[in-house]
Amino acid sequence: MPTRGYDFASPKIQTVFYDNIIFTILLMQKDSGAPCTDCAVFPRGAIMKRLIGILAALCVLVGCKETKKTIKIGIVQLVEHPALDDAYKGFVDALSEAGYVDGTNISIDYENAQGEQANCVTIAQKLVNDRSDLILAIATPAAQAVANLTKDIPILVTAVTDPESAKLVKSNDVPGTNVSGTSDLTPCAAQIDLLKRLVPNAKTVGMLYCSSEQNSVFQIGLAKAQCDKLGLAYIDATVSSTNEVQQVTQSLVGKVDAIYVPTDNMVSSSIVTVAQVANENRIPTIVGEEGMVERGALATYGIDYYALGKQTAFMALDIIKNGKKPADMPIQYLEHCTLAVNRDTAAKIGISIPDDLK
């Protein structure tokens, strides 16, 4: 929107403004006693040319400069837990480092669904109705809610394990929709290998996850395949709400030698409860990301969600600055993974950490 004053980019406004100035000059000459016929020496076209330089300076003084549009970015996050919080922070920080600051040249509307799918839909509808220029969806359920409501607004996702199996894109290599972003696919096979290293005598693994989270189902499939290779048996322990986490975890006591938790949003938000039950019963818990280790789980080999958020912001900049389309932007992954071990937990449950993992 232009600032207050004349929009000198409009030819019509230019003509009216020039004519008024010319008329004023003629009146001034008349008032000074000079005959108006003298003005014939300066044809209208010549006078207009002489005025262009003056008008250029006047434009600055009267505020005719066009202001840049504020870019509206809507963000919906499924739930609060360290991994998703870090992804959000990385996204915002990377935009700021690139000169796109909330309240200055971009407007960020951040909403948290508090783990409720119904809230995801309500928030997604709000962001679409507000005509956001770009929407960031953090976690698979949030991404699905937004993608179901708009096929026009560019959508970037992060902390989504497999956008293709979540039906957000036609393929991860060539999305072909208004959705792209970054995957938080962790090395599930390597995590099961880590479990076997830390618990060499393990025979049975409890698979603790929410069966309605597509990202978790995908990871559990990979983890089970690796268990099969290593000769490990497994028991599914699924939850449908955070209220069930403690009871379901307790049901594994005496049945399993270790517990595996993927990057499951529902279980992650209740990982303190899981760790408390597991640690009291000296059951090692291998998880999908470092935030869960910090809150009591034993270990992980996973990605940095802050870096994942920053990588998503770089994709957003490509859309904002370079006009790229999500349809043509492949899903991106982090290549580097990090080992994290909670030594206090290890000591509490009697696990010795091999020297090469210290």
Model features per residue range: what roles?
Residues 21-22, 44-45, 49, 64-358:
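Short hydrophobic alpha-helices and adjacent helix-cap/hinge residues
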Residues 1-8, 12-71:
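Short, low-complexity disordered leader/linker segments with a strong preference
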